[in-house]
Regions:
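Short, glycine-/polar-rich solvent-exposed loops and beta-turns at beta-strand/coil boundaries
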Residues: 61-62, 240
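ATP-dependent carboxylate-amine ligase
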Residues: 1-52, 64, 68, 86-89, ...
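Phosphate-binding loop of NTP-binding sites
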Residues: 24-30, 47, 61, 72-231
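Short acidic-hydrophobic, aromatic-tinged amphipathic segments that line or gate anion-handling sites
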Residues: 53-56, 92
Length: 240
């Protein structure tokens, strides 16, 4: 999945977005280490699975690793980021791992201001109960996974796409689901036009045969539909 990389260190490994990634990487057989600011049940679980997890942040934790995985929340002055740059270690964003999963599967990516986690979870459970053995990456804990992700052997994957920092534009799924678009994450996008343009770009990542399943009740989604030439399947409660 990640050519030439074996030892991977995740900063903030216990966070809601990172824990799903860590679980996938451990199950894929990578030599995983990580760091976080406090002990937790999920950190204990990762240790039981064979990962090395440190409490606190220290430049020594990245010695000998092939790559660092971070989220946008990790500051540039984090000592592990600083050390990785000094040593020329590859620094990946968590979205790069999500992309790597999508690139080798028939990927379904779910985005939107509200309902991403629930929708991703429901699609994942449908595939699990249909014995499709999917790979699932969610931003929250769900009962049927006993966590927030699972590594399947089937050809489907379903992931929660994070539009908050624009990193969802790295993804190239075969199917996109958009629950709604609202004036959210303005700290990153600054204007509603920028947010809408990002969603247009996201839909344009679909291959020609790809489909976008969207809530047709949402005015902003209808705007995206008017801008992008892709196949849309709409759902909603309104008569139109």
């Amino acid at each position: 999945m990640l050519d030439g990389i074996h030892k991977i260190h995740l900063i903030g490994i216990g966070g809601s977005g990172m824990r799903a990634i860590a679980n996938i990487l451990i199950q894929k057989g990578y030599d995983v280490s990580g760091s976080d600011i406090a002990e937790s049940a999920v950190i204990s679980k990762f240790r039981d699975m064979g990962a090395t997890v440190h409490i606190g942040h220290n430049k020594e934790y990245v010695n000998g690793v092939d790559a660092i995985v971070r989220s946008t929340a990790i500051r540039e002055d984090n000592p592990e980021i600083v050390a990785a740059k000094e040593q020329g270690i590859t620094i990946l964003h968590r979205s790069d791992i999500v992309k790597a999963v999508l690139d080798v599967t028939d990927g379904i990516a779910v985005a939107g201001a509200h309902g991403k986690t629930s929708t991703t979870s429901m699609i994942g459970q449908i595939l699990v109960e249909a014995n499709a053995d999917p790979t699932v990456i969610i931003g929250g804990e769900v009962d049927y996974l006993k966590g927030s992700s699972c590594l399947g052997k089937g050809h489907f994957s379903v992931v929660e796409a994070d539009e908050s920092d624009g990193s969802f534009l790295k993804l190239h799924p075969h199917t996109i689901v958009i629950t709604n678009i609202e004036d959210d994450h303005m700290d990153h996008y600054k204007t509603m036009d920028n947010l809408l343009n990002a969603f247009c770009e996201f839909v344009e990542t679909l291959p020609e045969a790809g489909k976008a399943i969207v809530c047709g009740d949402n005015e902003n989604i209808r705007y995206v539909m008017s801008r992008v030439k892709r196949t849309f399947i709409t759902y909603g409660l309104e008569d139109n």
